Amino acid sequence: MDRLFEPLNFRHGPAMKNRFMLAPLTNLQSHDDGVLSDQEFKWLTMRASGGFGLVMTCAAHVQAAGQGFPGQLGIFDDVHVGGLARLAAAIRHHGSLAMVQLHHAGLRSPPDLIGGHPLSASDDEKTGARAVSYT
């Protein structure tokens, strides 16, 4: 039990101040365009100030067509950089490490949410998903 409060060293990068990590939670707090909201910023930085050694965001979609749920954090456009940089700095200010969970909902992206058919690793007749290709 005492080891929970000891630093955790990694081969590369900074050490965690302790072994407590905030798991990525689905909190539905971001703006419709994926920009971090003030509410989500406050919620996550409160976890850092509360003593977590690492604070991880919710699943952040890496492509607009990969959004899985309303209020999901985005990390696919320059418009997201300011909020994410501000969040990382605030988390580090409290001595915690900041981490983003990367996510793409694939064929589970709701068509009404993404405004079209979902993208997937391969075509799927049942859902109308089409394979991602970059030709």
Predicted regions and their residues:
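Aromatic-lined carbohydrate-binding/catalytic grooves of carbohydrate-active enzymes
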Residues: F52-D77
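A structural motif
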Residues: N18-P24, T45, A98-L102
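Glycine-rich, aromatic-flanked loop segments that form ligand/cofactor-binding clefts
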Residues: R47-A59, G83-V132
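Glycine-rich anion/phosphate-binding loops
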Residues: H31-M46, L73-R92
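Short, glycine/charged-enriched secondary-structure capping and boundary segments
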Residues: V35-S37, P70-G71, L113-G116
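Conserved small/polar residues in nucleotide/adenosyl-binding loops
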Residues: T135
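N-terminal amphipathic alpha-helix/helix-capping segment at the start of soluble metabolic enzymes
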Residues: M1-P24
